Amino acid sequence: MINFIACIDFEGLKGKNIYFESKYHDQTKQGFTQSYNNDYVLFRHNGSDENLDLFTKKDGKFLVFTKIFEEDKITLIKKLGINENVNIKDSELMLELYFKFGAAGMKCLSNGFIFILIDLIKENVMAFRDHIGIKNICYLHSDNSIYLSSSFRNLFNVNNKNFSLNLDKMDNFLNFKDSSNTNTFINEINKVPPSHFIEYHQDQIKVIQYSEYRLEDNLATANDQINGLKHLLKKSVYIDKSCKYSKIGFTMSGGIDSSTVISFFREFKDSAHKIFSFSAQYKHLDKKILNLIDESEYQNEINKSTDIYDTSFDGQDESTLSKLDFYLEVIGQPFFFPNLYLPNKAFSLASEKDVYLMMNGNDGDTVVSHGYEYFQELFYNLRWIKLLKEIDVTSRLRKQSRRFIFKRIILNSFSLSNFFNFSAKKKHLDVICSSNHTKAIEIQGLLASYYGIEERYPFYNRELIEYCLNVTPDLKNKHGQARYILKEAIKGIVPEKIRKRVTKANLGHALCLSFVVKDNELINAQLSKPNPAIRELIDLEDLRSSWENMKVDPRKYATNSLVPSRIFAYVVLNRWLDSLPLKLKKLENKTQNVYLHPYE
């Protein structure tokens, strides 16, 4: 929910015309309410004096801006040996952490954070981003100055700047190859990657990694590993101990992850928080696909509790493309999030009920893992008898053929180079470090901020992620059960009907229907008028043909088809290009290089 923008120029800001009033105001009508400026720094934000302060220490003069969560503040106070009764600002606490441990001290924080340290004497700037990217930092290097902000949009609105389109990113976006977590659709604007910081000194920028996840052998017994996971799940949902918020909301799909978050909070909370759940239902769809999408029977297992204030909405009434201009205004650049209407509707309803703290079960399946990388490890290490046994029991439990499971898990990702060189843990780590998670958090975070909501992701707790990475691989998928260790850890807390489910809703059916019924006019209009910048990047005739076929039989494209995704990506990008300001004068077929430096 923190929003900021800053300009630092150690040659002096005098004579520079810097305009930081955003052209966009969120629903809370709260712009940049706080400001700091001197001859070299202009900093505007919507936080408090907890977030930004000036310090004179160790013969230096430092401007510090930070945003940390309460749980991490408690941890840091203990780590630094500070008396709990001492009233210390977040900014001073983070400065003390840096003085004592340097950049490596940031590993002490388990949740989202921002830490910006401006050394006014040595003329040095450092901007740190958390381990997974819950908090965002964008930067723009221009005219001997560096601009920092919590959002792309803030920097794109800076006056008197000429920007150029990043055509490489556009191409990758359209072809689902955009794996970068540093660049944006504008060459001049970049992002600090998760677990990294940028250092700006003598008009040069370095991007430096300050931490990485540890992989190590786990010698604990299976039972101890299960109990360890249960402990960390409890710890990760134990938020707002000071009861700053009287109400806490939960996005509740009815899946295992969202059900785990709300169930653990409800089971272990020792506060008077009121619990609100927000769920999408699809009860009015054709009966042929109703059971493939609607999860209300699972949602009701949670929402029937008398201490939960349930708010359900009809997912059929919503679509992302029908409000595309709104999303582009909030996010500022193209995005790939076809089901964005779900968190948006939840945030909207939450704000109406004065719920301004929300918990989200995002990516529990990624963090804990379904465990199929264990099957791959067995295959590449020639443990084929064990592999066949695991596939056989999985086949019987999921009612899928052994051939289908083998093809999907082994053959579809087969590589000769993996033989005798494949590690299930390293594969899990690669998935965790994918840029997809960071991008999804950024997008949801901007939406949450629009409604004045602070969003929390218990499964993205750093300690929990590292623990799950090091769980023995055969505990992640055992006896045919994906995420076996999670299902054991939540036993007795999450309703059995949810804990034992082996299916998952396929929202692709809802997406295809909304395209054909609700978004047909917009899609046709965008396909008929491609922006000149996009024509050389995509086969429009093929896409138009696929769209016409999809309108005839949308159900055919709801599973294992890239057509809906291709249409969504094209429409979003094309609409954004048409809405660009006149200041975007040139096209450049390049991606700005971001050089990563090892932390010393």
Role assignments for model-derived ranges:
Residues 38, 110-114, 245-248, 312-369, ...:
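Conserved adenosine/adenylate-binding substructure
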Residues 90, 109, 166, 225-229, ...:
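Hydrophobic (often cysteine-bearing) scaffold residues that line and stabilize catalytic clefts
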Residues 263-267, 348, 573:
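Short, well-ordered alpha-helices that flank and scaffold nucleotide-derived cofactor binding pockets
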Residues 367-392:
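A mobile, often basic/glycine-rich helix-loop segment
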Residues 324-329, 373-376, 513-516:
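Short low-complexity, flexible loop/linker segments enriched in glycine and/or proline
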